Design a protein with these regions (language model features):
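Cys/His/Pro-rich metal-binding microdomains
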Residues: 31, 307, 326
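Short, hydrophobic/aromatic alpha-helical segments in well-folded domains
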Residues: 190, 237-238, 291-295, 305, ...
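Aromatic- and Gly/Pro-enriched helix-to-coil junctions and flexible linker segments
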Residues: 9-259, 312, 332-502, 506-546
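Bacterial N-terminal signal peptides
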Residues: 1-10
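Extracellular glycan-recognition modules
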Residues: 250, 264-265
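Short, charged low-complexity linear segments at domain edges
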Residues: 9-15, 270-296, 300
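Short metal-coordination and nucleic-acid-contact micro-motifs, chiefly zinc-binding Cys/His arrays
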Residues: 26, 299-305
Length: 546
């Protein structure tokens, strides 16, 4: 009789131990590979029934249970789970005790839900709108129906003045004046006026900039470590887009692909500041990790970054999905482009993304370790599999010349010539001033003369380079040795002239850099003398990491 009375208690205790001690461990360490999303080796462990069906436990005898043998194994190829640390002795003992007690399960145990069945991954369908008295707006009707079902009585409508105050604060972030509180125009007219206000874009841009992680650049001194210089251009684009009532979908496309969708429209290319903001100086993988993480969070509401080292614990995102997503961004880089009216990129410039290396290859990093790429398999760019049915086919596009060679634009060439001309004028003025000083300032005159010579050499180099570029861009694949050789020689002369100036300075780092530049220029000159004609196209942009 005592045994009979004790038996149900033991069964209940064993089932309770499973719920409290065993199932949480299985969920944390095993479901990712043996749950609803994936069943490696045909094993699923999210219910006791599935575990027993796979014959990996021998009820009452843990020593003969394959499950126990695998979690206790010292062989890395055999031990489960394969990632992370082994189960603790306490966790292993709890599993063995549970098996010894008969591997009992709680009554009515249900398997975990398939993440793909979650409403967030279902096709969007327009719901039926319930008919509710005195309510015309669909959202209000849906809310009212739910409130009625749950016995919730909504608060009464507020008076007009309070409603106007709330409207102002919501749409433009500013309180109304006393006169505006007395506005008797139709409600819709007030709403339209506030939506047309420039403050509307400024007020709501603040929230979107938080979601999209707007941040000005920062680093050490002049060194750029995070974000990009002049990123305020992206900020302005956000404000302007909201004020122009741009659709959310069009804004997302512009932020992710504005350089390809609008290659000859700098106003729209500003949107790619979203990607440029993720720049990180010290590690390319960290840079791309940030891009993947915050693109997923901002536009999908998903933590794709959790699948870098292993399949996602609870969302239908595999580790391969993570690297397919990375492959989309693998070729991209960031650069500063010149803007009309200012050739000095330190003062102004357009931070933007561009495809720098279309041949860049993506590999899976084993367990997320960038030092262990699996080079057996090349990963192609693609969205996560659960989105593949919606994905557009990848197509090659042809960009206009100024998009990939900004130096080919006439206004850019003119701006570079004007900047070089002003440097000559400034150096000339300094030389004239030095020549009128006393003999004690002879060293200053020597330096002023070198600066003047360097400015003139740089001006000639810009002129020759533009001439060579104009032929090169107008005649793809053809060569003009005279133009190319002149451009190359003037470039070398400009470097040598500038290195003389820097070597006379007091900055040790600049002097060292000048000596190295001089050495390279002389080597290049020697190559020219041997008949090897190569010149550098006009450099008007500044690429990240340069």
């Amino acid at each position: 009789l005592l045994v009979a009375l004790a038996l149900p208690i033991s069964v209940e205790a064993a089932a309770s131990a499973y719920e409290k001690e065993i199932k949480p461990v299985l969920k944390e360490r095993c479901y990712a590979c043996h749950g609803a999303l994936k069943q490696k080796a045909g094993l699923r462990v999210d219910t006791v029934a599935f575990i027993k069906e796979a014959s990996v436990i021998a009820s009452g005898d843990p020593e003969k249970s394959e499950l126990v043998q695998r979690i206790r194994s010292n062989d890395e190829e055999e031990r489960m789970p394969p990632e992370g640390h082994a189960l603790t002795q306490v966790e292993v003992k709890a599993i063995m005790d549970w098996i010894t007690a008969g591997a009992l399960a709680p009554e009515g145990e249900r398997p975990e839900d398939d993440p793909l069945e979650h409403w967030a991954f279902q096709k969007i369908e327009r719901p039926d709108i319930p008919k509710v008295d005195d309510i015309s707006h669909p959202v209000d009707a849906l809310l009212a129906a739910k409130q009625k079902d749950r016995g919730i009585i909504p608060v009464a409508a507020v008076d007009r003045k309070l409603a106007i105050r709330r409207l102002y604060l919501d749409l433009i972030g500013l309180p109304p004046t006393r006169g505006q509180l007395e506005d008797n125009r139709p409600w819709e007219a007030i709403v339209d006026e506030l939506l047309a206000s420039p403050q509307h874009g400024e007020r709501w841009a603040r929230h979107w900039m938080d979601v999209w992680r707007y941040s000005d650049w920062y680093g050490l001194g002049a060194q750029l470590r995070y974000s990009q210089r002049h990123l305020w251009h992206w900020r302005d684009w956000i404000v302007e887009s909201l004020n122009e009532n741009a659709g959310y979908d069009s804004m997302v496309r512009a932020m992710l692909a504005g350089d390809e969708l609008f290659p000859d429209n700098p106003d729209q290319v500003r949107a790619t500041g979203f990607l440029a903001r993720n720049y990180f100086l010290f590690n390319r993988t960290t840079w791309l990790d940030n891009t993947i993480e915050h693109t997923g969070k901002a536009f999908l509401g998903l933590t794709i970054n959790c699948a870098k080292c292993h399949d996602h614990k609870y969302d239908p995102i595999s580790a391969v999905d993570y690297y397919r997503f990375r492959a989309i961004f693998e070729p991209h880089q960031v650069r500063l482009d010149p803007l009309p009216g200012d050739a000095d990129l330190d003062k102004n410039g357009l931070p933007r993304v561009f495809d720098d290396n279309l041949e860049a290859v993506t590999y899976v990093h084993q367990r997320g370790d960038e030092k262990k790429p699996d080079k057996e398999t090349k990963i192609d760019p693609q969205v996560p599999e659960f989105l593949s049915a919606f994905a557009s086919p990848i197509k090659k596009i042809k960009l206009p010349l100024p998009a990939y060679a900004p130096g080919s634009s006439k206004w850019v060439q003119e701006a570079q010539l004007e900047a070089a001309k002003k440097r000559v004028e400034k150096a000339t003025a300094e030389l004239v001033k030095a020549e009128t000083t006393t003999e004690e300032a002879a060293s200053q005159m020597d330096l002023a003369k070198l600066k003047w010579e360097a400015a003139r050499a740089e001006h000639k180099s810009v002129e020759a380079t533009i001439a060579a570029d104009q032929f090169r861009f107008a005649n793809p694949g053809k060569s003009n040795e005279d133009l190319f050789r002149t451009a190359a020689k003037t470039q070398v002369a400009a470097v040598l002239a500038r290195s003389k100036v820097e070597r006379l300075g007091t900055d040790a780092k600049k002097k060292k850099a000048a000596r190295e530049a001089k050495k390279k220029a002389e080597e290049r000159l020697a190559q020219l003398d041997k008949g090897k004609v190569e010149y550098d196209s006009l450099r008007v942009t500044r690429k990240a990491l340069e």
